[in-house]
Swiss-Prot record:
Residues 159-328 form the OBG-type G domain. Its cofactor is Mg(2+). Keywords: Cytoplasm, GTP-binding, Hydrolase, Magnesium, Metal-binding, Nucleotide-binding. Monomer. One of its GO terms (biological process) is ribosome biogenesis. Residues 1-158 form the Obg domain. Pfam families: DUF1967, GTP1_OBG, MMR_HSR1. The gene is obg. NCBIfam families: Obg_CgtA (TIGR02729), PRK12296.1 (NF008954), PRK12297.1 (NF008955), PRK12299.1 (NF008956), small_GTP (TIGR00231). GTP binds at residues 165-172, 190-194, 211-214, 281-284, 309-311. The lineage of its organism: Bacteria, Pseudomonadati, Coprothermobacterota, Coprothermobacteria, Coprothermobacterales. This is GTPase Obg.
Length: 419
């Protein structure tokens, strides 16, 4: 049984650390010169396939992921520490799509690693800004922002456990207790008309369980929901045969058990080769002596028998434990790969480009990003940026395009006013 599980997340590479603006000051050393160190690089963000994960459940509540920022540089030419990379674990078989560039990567092997957001470069300290004509720079570079990506993750889910039972055996109630599924529950046959998917989570592991439409006698001949139901069962890895132990549905427990086993055998004998557990449900409606009789009655029928009550929750934790035990051997044993890939962002324009956007003039490109490295709230940085703007003749180009005095120009992420 295959379902589609999806999630949308935002990932951020760590910001690079700011460079330091400092000067060497030691006794007996005159004009020690600039000694500000560079900032550390921001951490990268990777997606890594992990065969132990089966669903995208972990992304239901956490949508944003951010790698660690680089540390700022310090005096005495000390470089800041690089930020730690962030590794996000995903199930094998996830298709990763960049929502902006439409780049698609199929993560179909265990151990694959995909770089989805690079960390920003650390800013240069003033020790590295010195030149032959600028021997004592009082400014430094700010750290670069890390890349940001909006990603869509899509996983085709195979239901690992199929709940098999006659109508009104309590499958829907049971799946609502052991998972967060919300099936329609009512006291009449065939309440469930299509498969209901639930995700059962235990510690850091999870598996997918499906409550499929109720079985009736003659299903293998197409009666009731018949062949549709049995096709769903065929694709699961583990069967959980759910029986109404209180016989409210009119079938005595042993009669119900033999009916279900008979239908599975008639449709495909291989279904009985699957790992399975017998679930005797609704025990809250039984007297203790009746429960003991059921234990004896089914002791030699199945190696795994669990007595549960979806109404009170009794036995449901034991059921989850048994299902995990049965599922573990069926999980992928494929050898992990060391394959590494990078999801590239489109390159920035070589120098810079100018466009009008609402009330602003926007300057983009590599040069614009370069300008954003400087802290224009500091006088020395501001003077340097002004010199760069004049060198590029940006103001002249803006006026030629119709820019007027008093209008705002945004260079990457910094705003200036045309004078």
């Amino acid at each position: 049984m295959i379902f589609i599980d999806t999630a949308e997340i935002i990932v951020y590479g760590g910001k690079g650390g700011d460079g330091a603006a400092s000067f060497r000051r030691e006794k007996f050393i005159e004009k020690g010169g600039p000694d500000g160190g560079d900032g550390g690089k921001g951490g990268d963000v990777y997606l890594v396939t992990d065969p132990a994960l089966l669903t995208l459940y972990d992304f239901k509540y956490q949508k944003e992921f951010r790698a660690e920022d680089g540390e700022p540089g310090r005096s005495q030419k000390q470089f800041g520490k690089d930020g730690k990379d962030l590794f996000i674990r995903i199930p094998v078989g996830v298709i990763v799509a960049d929502l902006e560039t439409q780049t698609v990567v199929d993560m179909d092997k265990p151990g694959m690693k995909l770089l989805v957001a690079r960390g920003g470069r650390g800013g240069k300290g003033n020790a590295r800004m010195a030149t032959a004509t600028r021997r004592a720079p009082r400014f430094r570079e700010l750290g670069h922002e890390g890349e940001m990506r909006r990603l869509r993750l899509e996983l085709k889910l195979v239901a690992h456990v199929g709940l098999v039972g006659l109508p009104n055996a309590g499958k829907s109630s049971l799946i609502s207790v052991i998972s967060k599924a919300k099936p329609e529950i009512a006291p009449y046959p065939f309440t469930t008309r299509s498969p209901v998917l639930g995700i059962v989570k235990k510690a850091e592991q999870s598996f997918v369980v499906s409550d499929v439409p109720g079985l009736i006698e003659g299903a293998h001949e197409g009666k009731g929901l018949g062949l549709t139901f049995l096709r769903h069962v065929e694709r699961t890895k583990v069967l959980a045969i759910v029986i109404d132990a209180a016989a409210i549905d009119g079938y005595e427990p042993m009669q119900a058990y033999e009916t279900i086993i008979g239908e599975l055998r008639a449709y495909n004998p291989n279904l009985l080769e699957k790992p399975r557990v017998l679930v005797l449900n609704k025990i809250d409606l039984l007297q203790p002596e009746h429960i003991d009789q059921l234990k004896v009655q089914f002791a030699d029928k199945e190696s795994h028998v669990v007595l549960t009550s979806a109404a009170t929750g009794e036995g449901t934790n034991q059921l989850v434990d048994v299902l995990f035990e049965l599922i573990s051997p069926t999980l992928s044993t494929e050898e992990p790969t060391a394959e590494f890939m990078t999801m590239e962002l489109p390159p920035l324009p070589e120098d810079f480009s100018i466009r009008r956007e609402d009330e602003y003039w926007v300057v983009e490109g590599r040069w614009a990003r370069y300008i954003s490295r400087y802290d224009t709230t500091q006088p020395w940085d501001f003077q340097y940026v002004q010199r760069e703007i004049r060198r590029k003749k940006l103001e002249e180009m803006l006026r030629q395009m119709g820019a007027k005095e008093g209008e705002t120009v945004v260079i990457h992420d910094k705003a200036f006013e045309i004078l």
